[in-house]
């Protein structure tokens, strides 16, 4: 990640856990490509640029400075660079955040974008916001949990159809936020219309489209809808012939999208690959919302098995159509039971699971539900550790980033922030806290202890540690192991 002040996220975290090394990730790659101008020299930009003389450039993504999925400054630089390279008509389709940043901050982000687009209009570029909606309700679903979310985005962005119509985005956000149970995350879809009531920016044949998020997981589904001619997840009504590129390639195995502006990090020689080819049979399991993390991201942004005879991946369907605070226990016990079964079967030397509760429910702002979620995760951990005790195994318990351990917004002194009514403001984003790690179990060799000479160990140190626990030396270029054996 760019700096120590950037919040970790699940994708970067699982990349580090699985790869054993730190790779420049989405935000850093995009920053570099924009700063050097390399982005504009690549095949992806050249591809979309062919639409500039006669058609519209559409930009779809999260309007935020959270740095988890996207960044506003990168969007502004991309708009600037495209306008300087021939884009005469630009439409931005915004998705409001309120999850990785403060709820309500979308108004300020929209004002910043509107002001910049107004400056471009003064220079003769027809640049406007065309549509919008909240990230959890419009476009940004993941792992095929709810295609209805993507359809709402498609209807607004491509067809120019939405239940709410406004003359500008700031007015839209302010008005819609006043509706009951509405927040930045769950803002209903809207389109911007002209003085005649016509939408200003539907996507049509010949247009160029860029999804500008750098994080992959919540762009894959809209990328499929934009790129695949053979598509049956919802009725697209029409499928415009466009030039589409992602900010990055979101799925290396699917080659999706086929065109992209920034080359992805090349993550090779992951711990999963090493262990599989050295005879370590592996079982990985989570529910839908984190299944990709214990497989695709763990394996270096690679879909599928290294060796299907040596691996088994199990996905438990997540609840769909509800927010996770409604069912905060999620599928923790089901995941644990699958893990327990895999352990007791003695078919596998490594069993890897992700319990999503504290992250997914922590994002909802409900402290009461998050307490229930954490208790469910605790129960699940006990089920797994009891099985490990039975077979004489070893456990490693850690996390990919912080979230539920602090759900209060704080000032620089650590004091809680209050709203205008004197109530504590709830934090829905990840945190900058270090994550814990616990290693134990009856299979742990006598004398194994944490090293004292790795005071700043992080997620990338876990891979070498796990390889050591399996009886292997880690590759020399991996981040060092966290453990050592001390003779008693």
Curated annotation (Swiss-Prot):
Reactions the enzyme catalyzes: (2R)-2-phosphoglycerate = (2R)-3-phosphoglycerate
Record-annotated active site: 10 (phosphoserine intermediate)
Protein keywords: Cytoplasm, Glycolysis, Isomerase, Manganese, Metal-binding
Pfam family, one: iPGM_N
SUPFAM superfamilies: 2,3-Bisphosphoglycerate-independent phosphoglycerate mutase, substrate-binding domain, Alkaline phosphatase-like
Binding site for substrate: 69, 99-100, 135, 142, 215-218, 290
GO MF term list: manganese ion binding; phosphoglycerate mutase activity
E.C. number(s) listed in UniProt: 5.4.2.12
Binding locations of Mn(2+) 1: 359, 363, 430
GO BP term (any one): glycolytic process
Cofactor: how bound: Binds 2 manganese ions per subunit.
InterPro entries: Alkaline_phosphatase_core_sf, BPG-indep_PGM_N, Metalloenzyme, PGAM_B_sf, Pgm_bpd_ind
Family named by the database record: Belongs to the BPG-independent phosphoglycerate mutase family.
Quaternary structure and partners: Monomer.
Protein name: 2,3-bisphosphoglycerate-independent phosphoglycerate mutase
Organism field: Prunus dulcis (Almond)
Phylogenetic lineage: Eukaryota, Viridiplantae, Streptophyta, Embryophyta, Tracheophyta
